[in-house]
Amino acid sequence: MAEKGDCIASVYGYDLGGRFVDFQPLGFGVNGLVLSAVDSRACRKVAVKKIALSDARSMKHALREIKIIRRLDHDNIVKVYEVLGPKGTDLQGELFKFSVAYIVQEYMETDLARLLEQGTLAEEHAKLFMYQLLRGLKYIHSANVLHRDLKPANIFISTEDLVLKIGDFGLARIVDQHYSHKGYLSEGLVTKWYRSPRLLLSPNNYTKAIDMWAAGCILAEMLTGRMLFAGAHELEQMQLILETIPVIREEDKDELLRVMPSFVSSTWEVKRPLRKLLPEVNSEAIDFLEKILTFNPMDRLTAEMGLQHPYMSPYSCPEDEPTSQHPFRIEDEIDDIVLMAANQSQLSNWDTCSSRYPVSLSSDLEWRPDRCQDASEVQRDPRAGSAPLAEDVQVDPRKDSHSSSERFLEQSHSSMERAFEADYGRSCDYKVGSPSYLDKLLWRDNKPHHYSEPKLILDLSHWKQAAGAPPTATGLADTGAREDEPASLFLEIAQWVKSTQGGPEHASPPADDPERRLSASPPGRPAPVDGGASPQFDLDVFISRALKLCTKPEDLPDNKLGDLNGACIPEHPGDLVQTEAFSKERW
C-alpha cells in the first residue's frame, strides 16, 4: 500500500521527503491538486494541497491564500497544520525562491456536494449545517475576508459528529470594510449557480453579501436536493433569478431596464416566488430564505443577523459565536495590489518583480511551531473543492452524476498540468470574462442575439442604422407579388453560392446569346431578362430586402420571408427590376 501511495505521489509531482506516506487522490482545490496522506511524524491522516508557483498569477493566489489561512482559527474552518516547501522543508522567508508549496491541512471525510448526490438531507440536518455555515461566515467576515467561492464542494462534513467546516480559500480576498473598493476588486469568482444578481451585473463591485447569497442557495439545495438557480450561462442565471426574486429598489430597476429590458416584467411581479418554487419547504424556512436571497445586497441579512433569525433559534448561542480578534486591515491589501500589478507583466519580467519586492510577505510566510502555539489566530484552511480556477476563468462545480473524487479517479494524468486540463472538462465550458457577459450582449428589438443564431443575421443586424429610405414602389410591388411563396434565407444563399462556384462562365450569360446580350438601356436600368432560364440571385436586392426585415420591430411570420425571395429574379421577358437604381437609392 505504501509503495502504491509513493507511486501516486511521484506521478503528480509530490516531493515531501519520507515523512508523508500512503498518498491517495482527493480532488482539486482552486489553486492546486489535493492528495490525502498519512503524516508519520504526527500519526494522523492529512490532506496535502500542492500549489505550483510558476508565474505571477499563481504566486499572487498562493501568497493571498497562505496569508489568509494563517490567521483564521475557528471551529467551522478547516485547520491548516503547516506550510512546507520542496522536499518537506519549512517554508520560511521569501516564497519567490520556491517553485512549489504544500499546504498540510486537516483531513475531512466528505463534502456537502457528495452528501447531496446521495439525496435530500433531513430538514434538521440542513438546519444544523446552515447554522454552522453562518457561524463560520460570521468569523470570516469579521476578519474582513470574503470567501468568494462558497459552494457545496467547498463545505466539508464530518459524518461522525456532524461538524461542518468551510474550506478552500484559494479565491478568498481581504476587503477592509472601512474603505471603498469600487473599481479595485478583481472579478467576483463565485461559481455562477451561487452568484448573486449584483455580481452578475457588476462583477467588479461587491461586498461580503455575495457569500450570504451563496449560503442561501446552499440552504435551498440542502432542503430540496436540487440547485435553486441552475442557469446554463450568466444570462439564463439572471433570468431565473428575476423570475423568483423581487426587485424593489428603483436603482436596481433602472439598471435592469438599461441592461436587459426584455427580461423584466412591466409590473415587476415575479412569476414563481420562493413559496411556489419550493413547495416542499416550510414557511419558516421560506421566510429565512426570502431575507437572505434579496436582489439588492443592502437588504440582505448578514451572517450575524442570520444567526439571530427564528429559523436558527434551536442552535443559536451568541456567546459561542466568536469573531476575529485580529481582522485584516487596508495595509494587508497593499501586497495584493503590488502582485496584481506584477500580474499584468509578462512572465519574463517576474524575476525583476520578485527582486523589487523581496520581503513583502516574508514575515507571514514563516511557519514556526512556537508561533502557532502563541498566536490567537492560526492558519486554518480546507483540503479543497472540485475544480481548478484561474482568476479570469469560472469553472462550474460538480456534475450531477459523480462526485469530484470519483471523476478524479476515473482520469489518469502524467502531470499536474494534465490534471488541470482534464478537470476543466467537468465544467459547462462556459468562460466568464470581465466585464460581465450581460454587458457584451447585442440588444435589438428587445431580444438578445443568442450565440446559436446564424452569423449572417448577426452581421446584417449591424447595418440597421445604415438603412435609410424605404424601398422603391417597384421593389415593393415586386416583393408583394411573392409574399405567399415559401422561402428560405439560407437556400437563397446556397443557390447563389452554387451558381458562382462553377466559374465565371456559369455566373454570367454566354456572350453569343442574343437574348442575353446587354441592351443599350439607360443608366440605372438593367437589361430585360429571359423567362425561360432559371432564376438568378441578385445580392444587392437580397441585402436590401434583408435590411427591410431587420428594421421591423415586430416578429415576422414565416410567410414574410417571401420578401427575400424577390432577390432571386425570375427571368420573364419585359419584367424589369430596377436593381441598380434601387440599390443606389437604398444606400
Curated annotation (Swiss-Prot):
Q: Where in the cell is it found?
A: Cytoplasm; Nucleus
Keyword ATP-binding assigned: yes
Q: Where is this motif: SEG motif?
A: 186-188
Determine the domain of life of the protein's source.
Eukaryota
Q: According to its UniProt record, which cofactors does this protein need?
A: Mg(2+)
**EC number assigned by the record:** 2.7.11.24
Q: Where is the Protein kinase domain?
A: 20-312
User: Which GO cellular component terms, listed alphabetically, does the Swiss-Prot or TrEMBL entry include?
Assistant: cytoplasm; cytosol; nucleoplasm; nucleus
The record lists the catalysed reaction(s) as: L-seryl-[protein] + ATP = O-phospho-L-seryl-[protein] + ADP + H(+); L-threonyl-[protein] + ATP = O-phospho-L-threonyl-[protein] + ADP + H(+)
Query: Which residues are ATP-binding?
Result: L26, G27, F28, G29, V30, N31, G32, L33, V34, K49
Disulfide connectivity for this sequence is none
Which SUPFAM superfamilies does this one have?
Protein kinase-like (PK-like) (SSF56112)
User: A GO molecular-function term, please?
Assistant: protein serine/threonine kinase activity
Q: Where are the transmembrane segments?
A: none
* Subunit: Homodimer. Heterodimer with ERK3/MAPK6. Interacts with (via FRIEDE motif) MAPKAPK5.
Q: What does this protein do?
A: Atypical MAPK protein. Phosphorylates microtubule-associated protein 2 (MAP2) and MAPKAPK5. The precise role of the complex formed with MAPKAPK5 is still unclear, but the complex follows a complex set of phosphorylation events: upon interaction with atypical MAPKAPK5, ERK4/MAPK4 is phosphorylated at Ser-186 and then mediates phosphorylation and activation of MAPKAPK5, which in turn phosphorylates ERK4/MAPK4. May promote entry in the cell cycle.
Q: What is this protein called?
A: Mitogen-activated protein kinase 4
Source species: Homo sapiens (Human)
